[in-house]
Amino acid sequence: MEELAKKERRAMDPGGLKKEGKVEEEAGKEEGREEEGGEEEEVTSETLRGKPRPLPISALPAFSYIPPRHQGPKERSYFSREGQTGIVSLYDCVFKRRLDYNQKLHRDDREHAKNLGLHINEEEQERTVPVLMSSVYGKRINQPIEPLNRDYGHVSHVKTDFYRKNEIPSIKGPGFGHINPA
């Protein structure tokens, strides 16, 4: 019982019984007891708080874990580009907001309410496989899928030349030439 009372007093007065005046005597007695009975752990806020326990296996997400900061190469990131923003603290997000008026923004408080400040088209052009389905159309406008083939270009010239020289009236408009439509 006496040891329990001393532990409680020591927890309440971490300075070690300075109020009673018998600091040196009590400290010597306690050290002797600690050596005999084993080491006693000093009670601090860190030991009371303890180490944070890891989550149980059932609480861990299987495939949905997203790391807070992506540090890998840009080819392996979702957006295929380097992160441009640094670490912004919660205090700055809440208390250091821009208070100036932007007339192009919607009345909503969201920062990217109408995608102002975002560069979606540039991100889509940098990706090897586009995320947005609408970006597939015209994705490779600078790089045509099939190279231009001029091998059969002379066919159209031959056809026009043939019909012009032989004056075939079916090519010409109605009522023109010696054959009139019935």
From Swiss-Prot:
Main subcellular location: cytoplasm
Region (Disordered): 1-54
Keywords, ordered alphabetically: Cell projection, Cilium, Cytoplasm, Cytoskeleton, Flagellum
Cellular component, GO, one term: axonemal B tubule inner sheath
Database matches in Pfam families: CFAP90
Organism domain of life: Eukaryota
Locations listed in the record: Cytoplasm, Cytoskeleton, Cilium axoneme; Cytoplasm, Cytoskeleton, Flagellum axoneme
Record bears the keyword Signal: no
Job of this protein: Microtubule inner protein (MIP) part of the dynein-decorated doublet microtubules (DMTs) in cilia axoneme, which is required for motile cilia beating.
Entry protein name: Cilia- and flagella-associated protein 90
